From Swiss-Prot:
It is found in: Cytoplasmic vesicle membrane; Late endosome membrane. This is Charged multivesicular body protein 4a. The gene is CHMP4A. Residues 1-116 are annotated as: Interaction with phosphoinosides. Residues 20-105, 155-180 form a coiled coil. Residues 151-222 are annotated as: Intramolecular interaction with N-terminus. One of its GO terms (molecular function) is lipid binding. The keyword Protein transport applies. Residues 1-150 are annotated as: Intramolecular interaction with C-terminus. InterPro entries: Snf7_fam. Disulfide bonds: none annotated.
Amino acid sequence: MSGLGRLFGKGKKEKGPTPEEAIQKLKETEKILIKKQEFLEQKIQQELQTAKKYGTKNKRAALQALRRKKRFEQQLAQTDGTLSTLEFQREAIENATTNAEVLRTMELAAQSMKKAYQDMDIDKVDELMTDITEQQEVAQQISDAISRPMGFGDDVDEDELLEELEELEQEELAQELLNVGDKEEEPSVKLPSVPSTHLPAGPAPKVDEDEEALKQLAEWVS
């Protein structure tokens, strides 16, 4: 390749990393920055202790410790910002990867559904449902024909059967009434036989005294 081509970037472009590779690289960088945060926090605490140690005894050494502490705090703030940016970028790639996978799945599902219905239309469905309904009706008619009794009972007069049934009911009712009458009839009372010997005569009844007096008076008058 000529130097001019390399200068204007017309050469073959390298293939970029996959989302998975980018996410993995970001995670590794995040781990490095987290370790740097821990290191800077330790240095800040050390310089703070140094400044407290010298205090007013060695003002110059105390000020130098505070200056170093300030620089470490600035580096820590930069590291915090960088780490936040990397985390945001990694989450964005993860979300994009998830969304892309969801879209691919939806596309495959749509293609599969389209393939499943490519030989179908509403007219064919209606025709199929009509055929199914007709076949169900035929099946029902066949079932009815099979279950219908054959060879007897078709020429029997229904009115004649009802009349015969009514006669049987009347006979049964009359028999029930007869049975009730027999149960209600009282059994005859058997009287004792007349004795063959004469009973002794009882004492003669006493004549009323008034009648006797009237009889005597009538005889006296006559």
